[in-house]
Amino acid sequence: MKVLSLFDGMACGALALQAAGIEIEKYDAYEIDKYAIKTSKYNFPFIKHHGDVFSADFTTYAGADIVCGGSPCTHWSIAQKNNRETEASGVGWDLFQQYARAIKESKPKYFIYENNKSMSNAIRDSISDAFGFEPVLINSALVSAQNRQRLYWVGKRKSDGGYSKIEIAQPCDKGILLRDILESGVTDKEKAYCLKHQAGNARDYLKKHHTQVAFEPVILNVPHGFNKGGIKEHKTPTLTANGAWQYNNYICEPIRLGDVGSSSQAHIYEVQNGYITHNGKEYPIKLADGFYIIRKLTVKECMRLQTVPEWYQFPVSDTQAYKLLGNGWTVDVIAHILHYIKQDSRKGDAKK
């Protein structure tokens, strides 16, 4: 399949094509982020990268099998507190127009356009008018441990040059929960918040700013005898014959604590009666009473939320990896959509 990918990011489109069992004959990608280009090129050396979509001549890709992409949703998302665009104008719309231009100039057999569900109705309607049909809404929670609701416009070229909608059924629910993808620790939720471009933290999570974290159960072991004490994760110190933990294991108050007499420190939080305290304020939480460190999700855990295969590598910093994953696609959702395109393509070949 000859692919033209706009706003390609970390090449989730290439990952999805592989997952759907579709051979990639040629893959041209438009992307300007140097870290995205470095990462996708590292994993897929065959990708040919180009620059800015605004300067592209998409007629050179005439005869492409598929155009895929999702213009940056930053300007349209409800998470955009300042200067959110709600009409079909502005920077966000200009970016979409480049995608629409790519369709018009390259005349692909199929296309997939993705964007955030939280865009305004006016923008959603304008996109649907441009394509000639309504999108399908799919929540990544069906195939992963992440709530991520996205709109997908999936089109097939007609004989008159326009496009008709390919009907996409909802994926089967795989029943994957957040606890299933954690490398360690526990969680108070069945599904993660929608992955964003930066790692979560305790403050944002507890204040419902929708960044995801995990909880690591710990035991604070204070010095006693030959035991130097310290924070003990996962395992308690040796249980003595009298049934005690050598008298020095305590559930601590939610303050900044660490090894007693040591310079190393960690934020420790106590959950008691369904509440956790952060900066003097209580928040309800569904965790067993106990003693926890709150940590951000690891890069590997975020990969699992986006159903990125374990072999995929990031030759960039974790900060950039989080950004790429947060801005990327849920691979298995795109692969699900591609299966329908694959079936339709086979029907077309059979008629020839």
Please report, for each region that a protein language model flagged, where it lies by residue.
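Conserved active-site and SAM-binding loop architecture
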Residues: 1-352
